[in-house]
Regions:
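Short, highly charged C-terminal tails/helix-capping segments
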Residues: 160-176
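A generic structural motif
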Residues: 82-83, 112
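Beta-strand/loop substructures that line and gate deep hydrophobic ligand-binding cavities in soluble
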Residues: 12, 16, 89-152
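Short coil-to-beta-strand transition motifs
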Residues: 71-75, 100-101
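Short beta-edge strand/loop motif at the mouth of beta-sheet-based domains
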Residues: 14, 34-72, 171-176
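Hydrophobic ligand-binding cavity/cleft-lining segments
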Residues: 1-46, 176
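Non-transmembrane alpha-helical segments in soluble domains
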Residues: 27, 37, 152-155, 159
């Protein structure tokens, strides 16, 4: 499970999760627009249904999806900095929130993993510490709290996809 915190000034969300897979694989899950709709979401909640990305500094991206209530949403922005497979910095403009001007920074650090099998998708014996930093909430505590809950779910979904192949379609539905 991801660890997550909101800074005392309520401006920054910081989260971390360990993924038992090489950072190249984690980077791919985060940046490949054909993979994002496979893992970003859960039945009974919301899910991304379409993503597109011009993956370069200055390039634009968007993800569209639908909530359990049928309401559509969209997140879009621009890539500010990219250093594969270590770093992604992007603006974050969601249709479902009143925040503007926020920035998401993803840092991926390779870490050794002891006791893993030497065959299968993680045969390299390395894992990835994913650090997420979402800035720009400007004392908007309700939005920061909402996004913190969302990032906790998203990081868990990504971890389950990369480690176990779990998708939004195969994941256990959220109970009402």
């Amino acid at each position: 499970m991801a660890t997550i915190a909101i800074t005392p000034d309520q401006n920054v969300i910081e989260a971390e999760i360990f993924v038992a897979a090489p950072r190249e694989r984690v980077f791919q899950a985060l940046t490949d627009p054909t993979q994002t709709p496979r893992w970003w979401g859960q039945k009974g909640m919301y899910r991304v249904t379409r993503s597109e990305a011009d993956f370069r500094p200055g390039g634009k991206y968007f993800s569209e999806g639908e909530g359990v209530d049928g309401k559509k949403f969209r997140v879009e922005g621009e890539y500010l900095e990219i250093d594969p497979p270590r770093l992604i910095v992007q603006t974050w403009v969601p249709s479902f929130s009143n925040i503007t001007g926020t920035v998401v920074r993803w840092e991926l650090e390779s870490r050794p993993v002891h006791g893993l099998q030497t065959t299968g998708p993680n045969r390299m014996g390395t894992g990835t510490l994913v650090k997420l930093r979402h800035t720009g909430f400007a004392n908007n505590r309700p939005s920061a709290e909402d996004h913190a809950r969302g990032w906790q779910r998203v990081l868990g979904w990504m971890q389950a996809f990369v480690e176990k192949g779990e998708t939004a379609d195969t994941r256990e539905p959220l109970s009402a």
